Amino acid sequence: MIDYSNEVFTAIGNAVRAEHANVAIVGENIRQPSSFPCVAMDETYNVPSQLSSSDAEEYAAVTYRVQVFATGEGKRAQAREIFATVAKTCHGLNLIRKTYTTTPDLYNSSIYQISATFEADIRSDGMIFRR
């Protein structure tokens, strides 16, 4: 299995921490964080997209889910600012955003959440290609 999720998550986490103070970073899918603001990341899809003649994986198609949680006064603006950093970092890594959703108003939640997915192909040496 071609797995560069730690490298991707580290790059995103470092960028978020550099631009936003006191953001919790979590490397798994969560329903609700224990502290706010929070960025949660997980790999939801990783399958071979090309094999070599010896059946070794050459490329993997991957999808990463990123969730941004904020609460309190200005929660929407805060979540969007943090997400902008995530999106800019992912774009720099050649990860393309495929989905973007926010917490539906029907929940009348005190927590604002942005959830997005980013996709790419990763070569066995870690090079990331847009697809």
Say what each PLM segment does:
Residues 20, 74, 94, 126-128:
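Secondary-structure transition/hinge residues
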Residues 1-11, 32, 46-61, 96-131:
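Short, charged interaction patches at domain edges and termini
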Residues 42, 65-69, 117-121:
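Residue-level recognition of well-ordered beta-strand positions that form the cores
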Residues 65-91:
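Mid-chain, well-packed structural core segment of small domains
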Residues 1-52, 74-75, 81-82:
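Small/polar-rich, solvent-exposed N-terminal microdomains that initiate assembly or binding
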Residues 22-27, 94-102:
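Short secondary-structure junctions
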Residues 19, 85, 89, 114-117:
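Compositionally biased, intrinsically disordered low-complexity segments
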